[in-house]
């Protein structure tokens, strides 16, 4: 691996999972606090699998800890529910996660915001961060409207081919585009902003 001085050195690297496994295998008492923490996190995850409401409570606590407002957190949780309803509809129609979902999501974004998810992330100065976690309340509402509309149009029209799904996604995004078009050009710029919810 190339170091800051430009020279290459043999370097041990690990991903997160490998690092946790390595910590578990260390016999030193100094590793014990990490092992206990890993066990605690695993227990919490198992509890959440038994009682999904705990996952929601954990998500709320995590967003709060990251500095999001209660109002934004409520909007975000609602957007997660609407997104899941849409992806459930796509699965029911035989679409697969991955390329299908990503393509249709890009079409929805492009139809209401004039940006694909990649362009939207660039607009907000994001790299690996989740785009929806960095949308303002207005942007979340518009995206929820687009995704909810897409789901309802899909249920009504029962698309069979992927090209039909593309058409449905465009129609759903257009529904959310209407409030933006109804306003002036200045209002449109206020709907879409490089600002992030934690910037307020």
Language model segments and positions:
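Short, basic alpha-helical nucleic acid-contact segments in DNA-binding proteins
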Residues: 1
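Positively charged, phosphate-engaging catalytic surfaces used for nucleic-acid and nucleotide handling
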Residues: 4, 8, 14-18, 24-200
């Amino acid at each position: 691996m190339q170091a800051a001085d430009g020279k290459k050195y043999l370097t041990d690297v690990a991903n997160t999972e490998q690092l946790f496994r390595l910590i578990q295998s260390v016999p030193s008492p100094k590793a014990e606090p990490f092992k206990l923490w890993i066990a605690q996190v695993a227990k919490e995850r198992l509890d959440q699998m038994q009682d999904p409401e705990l996952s929601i409570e954990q998500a709320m606590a995590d967003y709060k800890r990251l500095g999001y407002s209660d109002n934004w957190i409520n909007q975000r949780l609602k957007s997660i529910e609407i997104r899941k309803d849409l992806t459930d509809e796509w699965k029911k129609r035989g679409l697969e996660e991955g390329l299908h979902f990503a393509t249709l999501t890009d079409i929805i974004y492009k139809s209401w915001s004039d940006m694909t998810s990649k362009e939207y992330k660039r607009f907000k100065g994001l790299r690996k961060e989740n785009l929806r976690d960095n949308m303002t309340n207005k942007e979340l509402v518009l995206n929820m409207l687009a995704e909810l509309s897409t789901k309802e149009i899909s249920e009504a029209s029962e698309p069979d081919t992927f090209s039909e799904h593309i058409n449905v996604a465009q129609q759903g995004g257009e529904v959310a585009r209407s409030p933006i078009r109804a306003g002036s050009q200045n209002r449109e710029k206020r709907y879409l902003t490089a600002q992030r919810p934690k910037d307020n």
